[in-house]
Structure formats: C-alpha cells, structure tokens
Amino acid sequence: THNQSHTLLTVLPALPARVRNALSKEQLLQYQAEETDKVLEPVLTYLARHDIRPHVLSRVGDPGSTIAEIAREEKFGMVIMGSHGQGALGNLLMGSVATRVLANCSTPVLLVR
C-alpha cells in the first residue's frame, strides 16, 4: 500500500423521475449524501485502522456500467467489490451489479463475498 493509490467508489442508483421531481435539489443532494455516508463510513473506518487513506468517489447512475466506466477512465489496476449474492432468481430478474461489472469491465475484477 505504500506506493499504491486506492479509490473508494460508491454508485447510487438514480431515483425514479417522479421521486426526483418531488424533491428540491437540496433534498436530493442531502439524500444522496446520507446514502453515500451509510455505505462509505464503515469502510473508511476499517481502512483507516490499516492506515489506508483512499480517494473517495461517489456517483449516481447505473452501478454496473458506471463502475466499469470509472475503472476504465481512471485506469484502475483492479476493481475489488463485494457480491451481495441475490441468488439465481434475483440475478435472472434484475441482474446483479457484479455480473454487469464483470461483463463491462476490461479491468481485472475481484469479487469478495
């Protein structure tokens, strides 16, 4: 970790248009910030204990394609991501973020369960 940089990325799915339209811009930004903090705070705490200070990115969009796109743009050496394991039926109906990242990402991907 001494000569490597680390990026911690979270991608929130966009809210449906009818929900976005019902919120002010400030409310939408506050919601996105709160949801991002829920995801990132425990990870940042864990990484800090191991003296890792990552660059943090937060985006809104389709998680699978956005993760792959950012990995390509930022020239990541590897993507390490969790797999929530929705099961075969969940993947069939919705597709998993991990599956979409694997399909769209030219960067090596390590899935952690």
Predicted regions and their residues:
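Small/aliphatic-rich secondary-structure junction motif
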Residues: 1-22, 46, 50-55
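Short secondary-structure boundary segments
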Residues: 11-13, 82-84, 113
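Intrinsically disordered or low-complexity boundary/linker segments at protein termini
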Residues: 16-20, 78, 104-113
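Short, well-ordered secondary-structure micro-motifs
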Residues: 18-21, 68-69, 91-93
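A short acidic, glycine-rich active-site loop
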Residues: 25-38
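Structural beta-alpha unit
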Residues: 45-79
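Glycine-rich, Arg-bearing micro-motifs that act as flexible, cationic patches
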Residues: 78-103
